[in-house]
Amino acid sequence: MAKKSKRIEFYDPIKIEKINPENMALLNKYKVDMAIRELAASTQYAYINNLYQWFIYILDNQNNRSVLELEDDDITEFLYFCKNEGNNTARMRVRISVISAFYKFLRKKKFLTTNPVEFIEAPKKSTLVLVQTFLTPEQVSAMREKLIECRDTQLRLYASLSLSTMARVSAIASLRWDQIDMQACVIHDVLEKEGKLVDLFFNEEVKCLLAKLKEERSISKRNDHGWLFYTGRCTDERHICKSTLEKWCKQIGEYINVPSLHPHDFRHSGATLLKNAGMSLEDVSVLLNHESTDTTKRFYIKQDTARINDIKGRYNI
């Protein structure tokens, strides 16, 4: 499995206040541009966060200069720092892409005549080996038992809801209480891939955990800002980060000796478990919100090889 990139701690609210005013003004114009282009909120957040990190590096190491004054060597210096701090190839490509997109915007608005990132060669794409896990019924049972022992209702709900709804991690991260119909066991108008609004369907186990979590939040008087899943960094506008849910997933995987477990595995596993239990491929595909059953069959269903081998044994060839 590909090793996750090391996290570099740039964030500092005091330093953000000291960032070159011209850089902040240009960033604000870029925010408006992204909003007009209707980029997903998560995409805008990721771009802004990456640019803040770069601005803080400029503040600390390059005399807080304007991005309009920087040359390709200055940007290369920042990228070299990130590489030495442990960022992997995929993370480095993201950093280059974000800075390049920002400069393309500045060039389009005639703040610049050239994009200095054009002179920087991106690292070659690494070959990532991603372990795809299809949880067995036995592993799901073990997961439930371990999560009961840890007494973390939010973590239990995350695992059970992800498996039951088979929703993508980006959708899970943005769920709000007011979308949930407890009686019908449906979560309405969930923003999914390509901007589609879909409904998610959950089981009785999830329904009980939702009620339990709601009661715990009420007793503790915690302000979750309306989000189903939250941490102390959430606000009215900012939901939980996907990276936090990935950490939760890794923790769950360690409980059941599946260290490679990642959020999308709940989606694969739920689909395969339903198919092997007798649900039609067409119905599974609908629940996954796929355009066709071909995608479902090729990437989301693990064939029951034991059953196929048993059938094969009936033929004496």
PLM region descriptions:
Residues 10-13, 28-130:
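N-terminal core-binding DNA-recognition domain of tyrosine recombinases/integrases
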Residues 160, 164, 267-290:
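C-terminal catalytic core of tyrosine-transesterase DNA break-rejoin enzymes
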Residues 203-258:
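Active-site/catalytic core of tyrosine-dependent DNA strand-transfer enzymes
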